[in-house]
Amino acid sequence: MADTGDMEHIFKRFDTNGDGKISLAELTDALRTLGSTSADEVQRMMAEIDTDGDGFIDFDEFISFCNANPGLMKDVAKVF
């Protein structure tokens, strides 16, 4: 699993406008970089990660997702 520093680095790369949260557009751009462009897949991931339903992924939600998906995060860390 990526360590907290790696997760913070990845979060900041996804959060392109630096507002401390990842929007649907930012998630779409990040997943496109990883080779995923399906709008349905992006929507599904957003719904899964955005546990409070505010339309954004905050750092705590991102950490929870990373901890639940360590294999995926290793792959993401290699790209970012």
Curated annotation (Swiss-Prot):
InterPro entries: EF-hand-dom_pair, EF_Hand_1_Ca_BS, EF_hand_dom, EF_hand_pair_protein_CML-like
Residues binding Ca(2+) 1: D15, N17, D19, K21, E26
Any one GO MF annotation of this record: calcium ion binding
Keywords recorded for this protein, A-Z: Allergen, Calcium, Metal-binding, Repeat
Record has Ribosomal protein as a keyword: no
One Pfam family of this chain: EF-hand_7
Binding site for Ca(2+) 2: D50, D52, D54, E61
Xref: CDD domains: EFh (cd00051)
Record has Calcium as a keyword: yes
Identification of the protein by name: Polcalcin Cyn d 7
